[in-house]
Regions:
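Polytopic transmembrane helical bundles with strong interfacial aromatic enrichment
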Residues: 1-152
Length: 152
């Protein structure tokens, strides 16, 4: 693959998951229940997008290593991405299982976990940007040129 998909795909889960937490907060602050179904859909779609983006990142990992990106930098980004997915998966499970007697609903707990998820999402994005802007992951470099000499 000549152009990596991962940098294209990551924007969707970032936007969807962030908006899901925003909708949860708006619903709680404004006392409006109609934000919850939208937040649940955003969480689900954000998780789906996150899984696809993660798979694309794993697919692009070898190319980044071959381009000289340090493995420790890649692993840090990958670990944060997986932790982020795990936190948002917990939120999605909490949302799907709400209303069961054995899982009481705790909006403060949900929102607190959501804030942790947002912090992880931000850190994942930061270190992903580091891979691109510091190490040049996924950046095509021009072929070296030889200086032209004048004929005298």
């Amino acid at each position: 693959m000549s152009h990596p998909l991962h940098p294209i795909l990551v924007h969707f889960p970032i936007a969807l998951l962030s908006t899901a937490i925003l909708f949860e907060a708006l619903g709680a602050l404004l006392g409006r229940d109609f934000f919850r179904p939208a937040a649940t859909w955003l969480l689900g779609l954000g998780m789906l997008g996150g899984i696809v983006a993660t798979l694309a990142g794993l697919w692009n990992e070898e190319a980044a290593e071959a381009a000289g990106v340090p493995e420790t930098a890649i692993e840090r980004h990958e670990t944060l991405a997986l932790l982020t997915l795990a936190v948002f998966a917990v939120l999605l499970a909490m949302r799907w299982l709400r209303g069961h007697r054995w899982i009481p609903e705790h909006p403060a707990v949900f929102f607190s976990i959501g804030l942790v998820g947002l912090a992880l999402l931000g850190a994942t994005g930061y270190f992903g940007g580091d891979l691109v802007y510091r190490y040049g992951a996924g950046v095509e470099r021009p072929a070296p040129t030889t200086p032209q000499t004048e004929n005298r």
